[in-house]
Amino acid sequence: MEFTELFKLIYENDIDTLEKARSEGVDFCKTDVYDQNNLLIAYAGSGYDKRYQPEDLIDFLLHCGIDINHKRNKRGGELAALHVAVSKMNYRIVSHLIENGAEIDIREINGNTPLWIAVMNYRGQENMIQIINLLVSKGASLDLINYHDRSVKDIINTIGGGIDAGHNKKEWDLRHLLK
């Protein structure tokens, strides 16, 4: 069974059907040929919850042997499931990935961590500030420098300077994290 067929199976079926497929030898650890995306990363970007809870499907995939910290190849930006869930602002998936051992400061192709992505994309959204607070409470670093010599603190201070100058909205201010 190919990757796209597996992803369709995940989208269309319930856990019982997925368990049956696994017992019949279906390999859920496959990746797509283009960017080495795995089913956990693909699911983290979509977060379907029509037939089952996201936590149930993540647990199923992890029990199938999927590496929670698997990253896409360079073509895919070396993103892990945690990066993708953060960028999609899906708190439930972010939280469950962290609870199950996702590396909190995993880096993508530019050296950016999930917290860096969250801060960079934050524009006052309630679910994103919850993700930022969760990442910080779980030990995500504000000080790690990416491959372009920028840290989360740098981004927070740059946005804060824009707020002080009247260029950015006040609700974007995250400088309270630096205290």
What do the predicted segments below correspond to?
Residues 28, 50, 68, 104, ...:
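Alpha-solenoid repeat scaffolds
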Residues 19-27, 57-68, 95-103, 131-141, ...:
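Ankyrin repeat domain, specifically the short helix-to-loop turn at the C-terminus of the second helix
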Residues 16-33, 37-45, 64:
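Terminal domain-start segments
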Residues 107-123, 127-134, 138-141:
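Conserved binding-pocket/active-site segment within a compact domain
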